[in-house]
Amino acid sequence: MGEIAFGNKLWIEKNGQFFLGKGRVELLKAIDSFGSINAAAKSMQMSYKKAWKTIDDMNSLANEPLVIRTTGGSGGGGTSVTKAGKDAISLYERVNANCHSFLEDELKNEQS
């Protein structure tokens, strides 16, 4: 038998609806980095329309917005990830790391 490896895909649901997964976390992190939905979408080779719909879907499921937009003004507009958004990123990454560690431990136990 060849080398065995475990893999997993984690997602978080809220009220039975898809809320957060790897791609959405990457989008939130890109928005946080660029301060722009358009730049974040381009960096992920995603359309602006899809990025905005994804944000709207997450915001509508969250208890408070994960992303907020500001318009115009002397400094120009922009987009930012809120504390709730950053907390959601941290939750996903923590749970994903724990799942990965669990699977690695199980694999080690299986191979010993």
Cite the ranges covered by each PLM segment:
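Residues within the DNA-recognition helix of helix-turn-helix
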Residues: T54
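Short helix-boundary/capping micro-motifs
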Residues: F34-A41
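Short, Lys/Arg-enriched N-terminal segment that forms or immediately precedes the first helix
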Residues: G2-G16
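Residue cluster at the C-terminal edge of the helix-turn-helix DNA-binding motif
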Residues: S60-P65
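Central "turn" residue of the DNA-binding helix-turn-helix
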Residues: Q45-S47
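Alpha-helical linker/hinge and terminal dimerization helices associated
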Residues: A88-L107
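Basic, amphipathic "hinge/linker" alpha-helix immediately C-terminal to the N-terminal HTH DNA-binding motif
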Residues: R69-Y92
